[in-house]
């Protein structure tokens, strides 16, 4: 496919027979290689697992410290901030039913260079996240088995995740559904324990988790926003299934909005209830910042509830997230390798199971290394992961505004202009609030990506290679 001078959005329904999603994929210059077997419910479950219904557990202590106790307010503001990103993802998912998600969306919406940079940026998130999740799981397991060192759990969780993903996407979807049910069941048990505590007078309802113990402070809420936003980062994982979802982009767009609404309600509920048990002026320090929610579970329902919540968080919630995270990362690596943006070696697909085996194994090895090296640096890795995601989301908003710039459909005016502009402004502010060291690491990573893109472009200019399908224009420098 050659670059064109027009940038018209794709039609809602391509002409002719056949699967509309496959026709759109072929119109973009790709062929269907992955197995399109996932229903809307499967995609929603996949998104819920990736975003983890119990996600606030692992970072509750950090969020509470930074927000001065206004944890519910932080997650509410984070939900509003990520709504604009969800709208942009939904719009681009309908236009480009391709597995690369933000990489593909920005590439086709704003050109080769920004597309590569968005993929490179989100790759920072994806390459670190599986290892980070193994660190969180190892910390939770160490609470239950202190005789075993934390690091020994890292390869265990990586191996389990890899074995499940190598079974294929259908098997992974089944495991995800079982894990989701278990997480929701544990959350119900925690809510019931809090209700019992309220009835017994051991704790009282309060506005403090929303408004603070003293005067409401927007500065404190925004200070904790980067950590809370990490819990909502899952839209890209959903859209990596564009070539495996029945209904393609339409199913992905619907799933994105459903998942955001569901997790926003779950996140706000659990952090609000947990914060009721924390006395005013409390500051979690050392290991207590990591185990804060687990310790609160013991106050609410005794040591049995603490053990249930801890084991569920480690063995079910975080493990399930690690499985999905590994699957998502491998799909992004596959997509970029297929486009020859990274070595094509990783674009190989197993003919029988229709999964990117080499990409999965590469992610597994990298996750093990990161988990072992950064076992005591989870707060920094968390901030770096957030930086990578938010930087990619910023480029997504730019792509939406640029791609739809010539469209005059007033019905989509909010989605194509106002929403991406607001989303971009909020994300830029949130990026500025991340840790200074995380910003430095992120900027260095992006600079390295720009150099790699420039170098590969120069090499490709002197050689004949298989080119990826071209976007509407190419704004690459030089």
Give the positions of each predicted feature.
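Membrane-helix boundary/coupling elements in multi-pass transport proteins
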Residues: 98, 121-134, 232-245, 304-344, ...
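C-terminal membrane-solvent junction of multi-pass transporters and transport-like membrane proteins
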Residues: 175, 346-353, 393-439
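TM-loop-TM module centered on a large, flexible mid-protein loop between adjacent transmembrane helices
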Residues: 104-105, 111, 142-144, 255-325, ...
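Membrane-interface loop-to-helix entry segments
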Residues: 150-203, 218, 255-261, 385-395, ...
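Helix-loop-helix junctions that connect adjacent transmembrane segments
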Residues: 71-72, 149, 178-311
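A generic transmembrane alpha-helix motif of multi-pass inner-membrane proteins
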Residues: 385, 389, 414-478
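Membrane-interface "cap" regions at the ends of multi-pass membrane proteins
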Residues: 1-70, 82-87, 99, 208-209, ...
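Extracellular loop-to-transmembrane helix junctions
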Residues: 54-150, 157, 259-262, 268-269, ...
């Amino acid at each position: 496919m050659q670059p064109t001078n027009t940038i018209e959005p794709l039609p809602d329904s391509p002409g002719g027979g056949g699967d509309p999603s496959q026709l759109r994929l072929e119109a973009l210059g790709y062929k269907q290689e992955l197995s399109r077997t996932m229903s809307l419910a499967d995609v929603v479950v996949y998104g819920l697992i990736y975003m983890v219904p119990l996600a606030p557990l692992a970072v509750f202590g950090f969020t509470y410290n930074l927000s001065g106790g206004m944890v519910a307010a932080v997650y509410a503001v984070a939900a509003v901030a990520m709504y604009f990103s969800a709208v942009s993802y939904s719009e681009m998912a309908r236009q480009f039913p391709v597995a690369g998600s933000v990489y593909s969306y920005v590439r086709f919406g704003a050109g080769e260079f920004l597309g590569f940079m968005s993929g490179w940026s989100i790759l920072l998130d994806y390459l670190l996240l599986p290892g980070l999740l193994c660190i969180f799981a190892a910390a939770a397991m160490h609470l239950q088995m202190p005789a075993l060192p934390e690091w020994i759990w890292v390869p265990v969780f990586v191996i389990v995740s890899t074995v499940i993903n190598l079974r294929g996407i259908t098997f992974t979807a089944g495991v995800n559904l079982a894990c989701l049910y278990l997480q929701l069941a544990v959350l119900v048990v925690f809510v019931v324990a809090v209700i019992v505590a309220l009835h017994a007078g051991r704790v009282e309802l309060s506005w403090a988790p929303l408004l603070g113990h003293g005067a409401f402070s927007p500065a404190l809420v925004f200070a904790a926003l980067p950590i809370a936003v990490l819990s909502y980062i899952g839209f890209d994982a959903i859209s990596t299934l564009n070539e495996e979802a029945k209904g393609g982009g339409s199913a992905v767009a619907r799933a994105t909005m459903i998942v955001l609404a569901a997790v926003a309600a779950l996140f706000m509920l659990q952090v609000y209830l947990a914060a009721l048990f924390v006395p005013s002026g409390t500051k979690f320090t050392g290991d207590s910042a990591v185990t804060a929610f687990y310790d609160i579970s013991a106050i609410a329902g005794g040591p049995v509830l603490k053990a249930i919540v801890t084991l569920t968080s480690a063995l079910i919630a975080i493990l399930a997230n690690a499985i999905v995270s590994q699957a998502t990362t491998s799909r992004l690596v596959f997509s970029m390798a297929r486009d020859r943006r990274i070595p094509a070696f990783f674009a190989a697909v197993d003919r029988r199971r229709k999964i990117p085996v080499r990409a999965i194994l590469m992610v597994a090895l990298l996750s093990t290394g990161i988990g072992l090296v950064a076992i005591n640096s989870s707060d920094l890795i968390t901030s770096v992961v957030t930086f990578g995601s938010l930087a990619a989301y910023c480029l997504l908003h730019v792509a939406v505004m640029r791609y739809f710039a010539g469209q005059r459909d007033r019905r989509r005016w909010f989605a194509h202009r106002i929403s991406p502009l607001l989303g971009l402004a909020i994300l830029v502010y949130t990026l500025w609030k991340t840790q200074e060291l995380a910003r430095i690491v992120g900027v260095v990573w992006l600079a390295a990506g720009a150099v790699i893109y420039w170098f590969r472009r120069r090499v490709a200019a002197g050689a004949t290679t298989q080119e990826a399908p071209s976007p509407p224009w190419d704004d690459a420098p030089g």
